[in-house]
């Protein structure tokens, strides 16, 4: 068995992140009746799940996951910057930024 360098495979973090994003959209809809929050949460959660699945099949196939988390980091980062509210924009922006960093580090640490 080859050592991947990580105790927990990257795709498990990806599935957890996808669940966080999707549940954020569902909670936004439940609390405020926000259909755009529900739609965006489910869309980005589904894309993150697809990206995590692709990572589980081929650890080099990072592009869907990286694009999804990078886009969310940018969008929610701007929302957090303008609103100053940690929930939900700051939380999702921070989690997205962490996922971009984790995927980026894993890209540079893997053998070519």
From Swiss-Prot:
GO terms for biological process: erythrocyte differentiation; heme biosynthetic process; mitochondrial transport; regulation of heme biosynthetic process. The chain crosses the membrane at residues 7-27, 32-52, 62-82, 86-106. The keyword Transmembrane applies. InterPro entries: TMEM14, TMEM14_sf. It is found in: Mitochondrion membrane. It is a multi-pass membrane protein. Keywords: Heme biosynthesis, Membrane, Mitochondrion, Transmembrane, Transmembrane helix. Disulfide bonds: none annotated. It comes from the Eukaryota. One of its GO terms (cellular component) is mitochondrial inner membrane. Belongs to the TMEM14 family. Required for normal heme biosynthesis. This is Transmembrane protein 14C. It comes from Pongo abelii (Sumatran orangutan). The gene is TMEM14C.
């Amino acid at each position: 068995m080859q050592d991947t360098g990580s105790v927990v495979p990257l795709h498990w973090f990806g599935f957890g992140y996808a669940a966080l994003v999707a549940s954020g959209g569902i909670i936004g809809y439940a609390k405020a009746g926000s259909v755009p929050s529900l739609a965006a949460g489910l869309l980005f959660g589904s894309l993150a799940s697809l990206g995590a699945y692709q990572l589980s099949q081929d650890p080099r196939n990072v592009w869907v996951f990286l694009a999804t988390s990078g886009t969310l980091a940018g969008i929610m980062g701007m929302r957090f910057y303008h609103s100053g509210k940690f929930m939900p924009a700051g939380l999702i922006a921070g989690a997205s930024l962490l996922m971009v960093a984790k995927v980026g580090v894993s890209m540079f640490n893997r053998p070519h």
